[in-house]
Amino acid sequence: MYQKMNKPYWLLKKIGEQLEHIKNKNIQAYSRFNLYCEDESRIGLLTMNHKALTIKGVKPLCRYQNKFDNVYLFGAFSPINGSHLLLEMPHCNTDNFQVFVDELAEMDRQEFKIVLLDNGAFHKAKRLVVPPNIALLFLPPCSPELNPAEKVWWVIKRELKNKFFTNMDDLAQAITNATKKLNNQSIRQLTAYQYCTNAFWTIFND
């Protein structure tokens, strides 16, 4: 499933130029390159109301709670082959992002990972140490619609809507059940936005 992006062609050109620079800089050390889209999403005990099917004339009812305990999901998803990493973190900050990029780097040390992500302050923190087999490629400011990872969060949260979780353990189990339904094929289908896959294959076509 490919998504058509209504953005100027300069974006595709800019990303292509950055990808070419990354390839030229690292081609001697790495023979395999992959593209990932990275993002974070907060999920908590606050009930997420959504539409529901009922008998005609019957108003849908949903047990609701107004609690704000939450966790953060850190995710990186490849629109090229569907490879992905998901980690649950207590906070969204530089320390936890460091843990995540280190785990992503270890997932395959022989693969050079180009990570497409937003301009969050902790993504650019001076004390962040980017592993040698990872390059961060930043999207234009205020453009979440350009990040394919948003589609993955939508699928996961869809499984949690209209659900009542008594505690964080129940929520964690529900998140686990939702993420187990994802696989490489579904990740690739969700995240294969043309603007980034076309740019990648234009540069890494050999």
Q: Positions of the model-derived regions?
A:
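Charge-mixed, compositionally biased segments that are often intrinsically disordered regulatory tracts
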Residues: 1-67, 200, 204
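Short beta-strand segments
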Residues: 37-38, 114-117, 137-140
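C-terminal anion-handling pockets and recognition modules
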Residues: 31-33, 150-206
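Electropositive, glycine- and tryptophan-enriched low-complexity nucleic-acid-binding patches
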Residues: 47-49, 54-110
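Acidic/histidine-rich, metal-coordinating catalytic segments
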Residues: 111-123, 147
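Short coil/turn segments at beta-strand junctions that form active-site/ligand-binding loops
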Residues: 31-33, 111-113, 134
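RNase H-like polynucleotidyl transferase catalytic core
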Residues: 59-66, 132-148
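Generic structural signal for small/hydrophobic residues in well-ordered secondary structure
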Residues: 39-41, 75-76, 82, 101, ...
